[in-house]
A protein has these predicted regions:
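Acidic donor-binding loop of glycosyltransferase active sites
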Residues: 287-297
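Active-site and donor-binding regions of nucleotide-sugar-utilizing enzymes
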Residues: 27, 78-181, 186-189, 195
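A short, well-ordered alpha-helix in the C-terminal region of glycosyltransferases
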Residues: 356-369
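C-terminal "capping" alpha-helix adjacent to the active site of nucleotide-linked donor transferases
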Residues: 330-331, 339-355
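A nucleotide-sugar donor-handling region in carbohydrate enzymes
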Residues: 164-226, 255-256
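C-terminal alpha-helical cap of glycosyltransferases
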Residues: 367-385
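Conserved N-terminal ligand/cofactor-binding loop architecture of enzyme catalytic domains
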Residues: 30-112
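Donor-nucleotide binding loops and adjacent catalytic segments primarily
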Residues: 204-206, 211-288
Length: 385
């Protein structure tokens, strides 16, 4: 690793992510925000590695992921299982072929890294870590590497050599890394990095007033993630409102204008349905929620843990999403529904069971770890700030 104490220039940290799914970029932004509060003598840059790959590769990589998650979940899950090996140190022949191919499309990215000359590289996605690790082995790069894993059950694709330290969202993840030959001294169970705003108290009365939410109803939040894989949202909305007359349903529609229009025409009584377009204040809404109906994305569920909000996880896609869901359900912070049609009835059951909601909320708070703060402290220590 470059020694920043031997130079008068600010220490340089490169946060490497990939714009496939929202969680990896959110994690990188959270760390960048935390580092921004740390020191003015620090140069931090975030790069989307996919933006520095050929257009055809970017289209296949992102498009394949989106298609699998939204249209072909079983095929996606099968591919996930077939590539999740070997569970031991070293590389299998198939892995070496895959990594060689990836190095070919990462040449522009590799040049960018060399030009930036970072003291430390922090990865929130697995694509580029092996390539940079090989550059370190060959003496072309002297920066250290940190890896921030964003799944509770990490896939073999996360494995890489020449990683100084690993940060995991949950203790359950550590067992898999040790099987890959990663020493326990290089593993920290930090929790998922989320924006520091999730750690700030939000007065309930102010949030209700600002968002014009009723104070006499439970708030249920429905979101389908960035690709809206949470089932037929409008149909779910209508059925939930039919079964649960004493709730206010907040639907996070993001930038989906078509969905916003359909929700606006849903004909719900005032105060019962609140469609929300894209906002960076979701933490306020979640803080007053009694239940979050969502997909089991790593960062999304970590935000719910920070807010202490029970989760109803809908039809987890086989793979990392299913792994996240199993972990949360096993620890009593979430309930899984494998069928969209069961979601409204499950919401009704939970709304009528205060004891179950309180227990889910308590378990969620107990699982939360302040990942951003832990990772930022480790970065500062590594750079001797």
């Amino acid at each position: 690793m470059n020694d920043p104490t031997t130079s008068s220039r600010p220490s340089r940290v490169l946060l490497v992510t990939a714009s496939v799914g929202a969680g990896h970029l959110s994690a990188a932004r959270a760390i960048a925000t935390g580092l921004g509060q740390l020191s003015s003598g620090l140069h931090v840059e975030t790069v989307d590695a996919l933006a520095l790959t050929p257009r055809w590769f970017r289209a296949c990589y992102v498009g394949g992921f989106t298609l699998g998650m939204t249209r072909l979940p079983r095929i996606y899950g099968l591919g996930y299982i077939l590539t999740d090996h070997p569970q031991r140190p070293g590389r299998a022949r198939g892995e070496r072929i895959r990594l060689w191919r990836e190095r070919q499309v990462l040449k522009q990215f590799s040049r960018f890294v060399l030009d930036f000359a970072p003291d430390l590289i922090v990865h929130t996605h697995f694509l580029t870590t092996p390539t940079l690790g090989l550059m370190i082995t060959r003496g072309k790069l002297s920066a250290g590497q940190f890896v921030v894993v964003t799944d509770n059950d990490p896939h073999r694709f996360w494995y890489a050599q020449n990683v100084a330290h690993w940060f995991l969202p949950a203790a359950i993840s550590a067992e898999r890394l040790t099987r890959w030959g990663v020493g326990e001294s290089r593993i920290t169970v930090s929790g998922m990095p989320i924006h520091p705003k999730w750690d700030r108290p939000t007065p309930r009365e102010k949030v209700l007033a600002d968002w014009r939410l009723p104070a006499d109803k439970k708030i249920v939040i429905l979101t389908g993630g960035t690709t809206f894989t949470c089932g037929p949202v409008v149909k779910l909305t209508r059925r939930i409102l039919e079964l649960c007359p004493n709730i206010c349903l907040v639907v996070l529609a993001g930038q989906n204008k078509k969905l916003l229009g359909r929700l606006a025409r849903a004909g719900s009584p005032a105060g019962r349905l609140v469609p929300i377009s894209f906002t960076d204040r979701i933490h306020e809404l979640v803080s007053v929620g009694s239940l979050m109906v969502t997909k089991a994305g790593g960062v999304t569920t970590a935000e719910c843990l920070a807010a202490g909000v029970p989760m109803l996880l809908t039809s987890p896609v086989p793979g990392q999403e299913a792994g996240n869901a199993r972990y949360l359900q096993a620890n009593g912070a979430a309930i899984i529904t494998q069928n969209y049609h069961r979601v409204p009835a499950e919401v009704k059951r939970l709304m009528n069971d205060e004891k179950a909601l309180r227990q889910l909320a308590e378990n969620a708070r107990g699982l939360y770890r302040p990942g951003t703060a832990t990772i930022v402290r480790a970065i500062a220590g590594s750079l001797r700030l």
